[in-house]
Amino acid sequence: MVTGWHRPTWIEIDRAAIRENIKNEQNKLPENVDLWAVVKANAYGHGIIEVARTAKEAGAKGFCVAILDEALALREAGFQDDFILVLGATRKEDANLAAKNHISLTVFREDWLEDLTLEAPLRIHLKVDSGMGRLGIRTTDEARRIETTIAKDNQLQLEGIYTHFATADQLETSYFEQQLAKFQTILTSLKNRPTYVHTANSAASLLQPQIGFDAIRFGISMYGLTPSTEIKTSLPFELKPALALYTEMVHVKELAPGDSVSYGATYTATEREWVATLPIGYADGLIRHYSGFHVLVDGELAPIIGRVCMDQTIIKLPREFQTGSKVTIIGTDHGNTITADDAAHYLDTINYEVTCLLNERIPRKYIH
């Protein structure tokens, strides 16, 4: 995707905020528990390479990604000796590519291990489906058979075993406890404990630090975002949001009563009013459902009017502004703040989706 460096729309990523979130989490972890930075999906929209560099500087001991291509991008960017785990499914025919690049893969099916032809040792993390219902083995018999298969092949190493909690971001813990118990049953069925046992995502690491095992997978909260609104007041420390989204007015005009804007003419002025066109649209991740949401102009709220277009959006101004005036979509302006959580609430979604939708057409600028 082409990045729009010559357009006045940009994202600012506060590296100091990422470092602070990591340091605060590390301070509450036992010394023998590693923190792995989850940088999948372009680091949740924050930029995979720069976030990985920042996380490593802050003390992260490795990285988790969703697909092999993300792991290879990290290797190509210079992360040659760092631990990298692919959390998602990898094609069997790509196992050798992962092995040659010293990338750890998730395995969750016995047949995936059959007839592998490897030119280098492959490190494997066994995924346990303890109740998430996506990927993973579900019985002790499966776990033991896979352990036996791996032990017979000197090119395979059972480096880790892990699971993922479905309700760690909820205050009610009964389902979480069921998952943990099932995982521990499968873990103890193995003849040999792998090097890495890991279960905790951001929510679990924040609320249930006792189940850190050997490593935690620090994702959404590394970026300063709360895993869910339900646990926002139960966090052990304040999270610092790292992402802000800005643009500038490229056209300012005054509407007369009866003038309409954007596709479908869904908004019509009822009085004389000032409006501005912004060079950002749904092709950038500002989806059409943002219509009616408010942005900040000189610290004042300004509503998005009419339909969000592919490349442009129109806002109603509180008064006349100059072309080139800055607009804050996510971030702080003159003491007022619009957060990713605010956008998520308006869109009836979660903060993860808000930042992940912001694609690479918007340039990222890294500060601090």
Curated annotation (Swiss-Prot):
Keywords: Isomerase, Pyridoxal phosphate. SUPFAM superfamilies: Alanine racemase C-terminal domain-like, PLP-binding barrel. Its cofactor is pyridoxal 5'-phosphate. InterPro entries: Ala_racemase (IPR000821), Ala_racemase/Decarboxylase_C (IPR009006), Ala_racemase_C (IPR011079), Ala_racemase_N (IPR001608), Ala_racemase_pyridoxalP-BS (IPR020622), PLP-binding_barrel (IPR029066). The keyword Isomerase applies. Its EC number is 5.1.1.1. Pathway: Amino-acid biosynthesis; D-alanine biosynthesis; D-alanine from L-alanine: step 1/1. GO terms for biological process: D-alanine biosynthetic process; peptidoglycan biosynthetic process. The active site is at K40, Y263. It catalyses: L-alanine = D-alanine. This is Alanine racemase. It comes from Listeria monocytogenes serotype 4b (strain CLIP80459). The lineage of its organism: Bacteria, Bacillati, Bacillota, Bacilli, Bacillales.
